[in-house]
Structure formats: structure tokens, C-alpha cells
Amino acid sequence: MILHANLVDLHQRQIYSVALEVQEQKIQRIQKIASDANLPFLLPGFIDAHVHVESSMLVPSEFARLAVVHGTVATISDPHEIANVCGMQGVEYMIDNGKQVPFHFFFG
């Protein structure tokens, strides 16, 4: 499948119109094309570097469902609140629940 987009290069601080070759949900090749401001923009997902998922009053899988629509693809999560209330059993629940979705939770 070939997709066309404006690729936001955060390192070079540039935007390039590109043709992306995608196979099995992975980008195989990127080729620059003539500039086209009407194409959708493609940029890396965001990582929330400090969050207490349990403060949202949501289980990790539901938190992920809502966060991903805003561009967040991962969190570095501090589970101290659930740990204070439920101990290791609560932390293990959060980890296990987070594994049910294609979102990356890093608990520490």
C-alpha cells in the first residue's frame, strides 16, 4: 500500500511531502515527492513521561483508548497510588490490564 503524507521531521525541523510504502502495518520505504500542503500530516506518537494512570479513575486499557486518539502512544507510569491502596496485587493488575491493548505502559 502506498500512502501520501506530509512527514514532520522533528530532528531536522522540516516537513516533507512523502510517499510511504506500507506492508504488514510497517513502513518499508519513504520517498520524497512534490510538496503538497493538502496532504495529512504524519508525526511520531507522544510519550507521556510521567503519569499516574489510576488518578484518571480508569483502568490502563481504557486510559489507552482515550489517550491514543490525542496522539499519545506510551506512558511512563508511576503506580504509587494503586500500590499504597492495593499493594503489589494492584500494581500487577495495572501491568496485566495494560498488556491487553496495543499501547505501551512502562510502570516504575
Regions found by a protein language model. Give the residues of each.
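Alpha-helix N-cap/helix-start motif
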Residues: I15, S56, N84-G87
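A generic structural signal for short, solvent-exposed coil/turn residues
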Residues: Q12-Q14, F41, K99
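Surface-exposed beta-strand edges and their flanking turn/coil or helix-capping segments
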Residues: Y16-V18, S61-E62, Q89-G90
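Divalent-metal coordination cores built from histidine and acidic residues
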Residues: R65-G108
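N-terminal metal-binding scaffold of metallo-dependent hydrolase/deaminase domains
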Residues: M1-A34
